[in-house]
Amino acid sequence: GARGYDPGSTNRHAGGNGGDSSISGPGITAIGGGGGATEHSENNPEPAGSGGSGGGASGSRSNSNGSVHGTGTPGQGHDGGTSGSHWYMGGGGGAGAVGGSGNSSGHGGDGLEDDILGTSYWWAGGGGSNTHHPAYYNGDKIRGGKGGGGAGAPCHSGHGGVSIPGPDANGITTAGAPTSQTSQWNWHSGGSGGKHTGGGGGGGDYHGNGITHGRGGLGGSGIVAIKF
């Protein structure tokens, strides 16, 4: 799906849902994951998408719970995380676990481990969320889920320094890293999902900056493996 971005309060774009993949003979369809929500406290918010796994809920600028998270599909993935009480977003759902709640940790949900290729890898981890305060970012609180999930973007340095989690390396490829922390409050983009992992992209800055900065990460491409 398309990356989410925020060029202004009247023209927000949530992350797009991933595309479905199918095998026509046995009639098997893997449903694409749901995109993450935009911020919802001002004009024209867009909610999280539902799919194979659900997108994470947005945070609220006021001291109240945020928007509804996306839901996953039983047998394929899990729900996105719920948002917290103040600027804290939920992580994207993974194939093996729900996304983290913004009240405590908006990390991406972990995927599933499988050795169909002869080596054990994790697949389809959810993307981590962004947050507006370092207390809810440091360590693995905004990490991408195991299976190529991209980590969420850091907050600006005016709120304090953060320890950016390393890109997830449990998949067949390593997820992309989010933008390094700067003093800009609308600059940071989330890390992209790992190629061929089916991992979700991490959330971008709470306040976006057009179509170039402050964007959600790209979702990782998937893979079809048939063993016989």
What function would you assign to each model-found segment?
Residues 1-228:
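Low-complexity, glycine/proline-biased repetitive segments and flexible coils/loops
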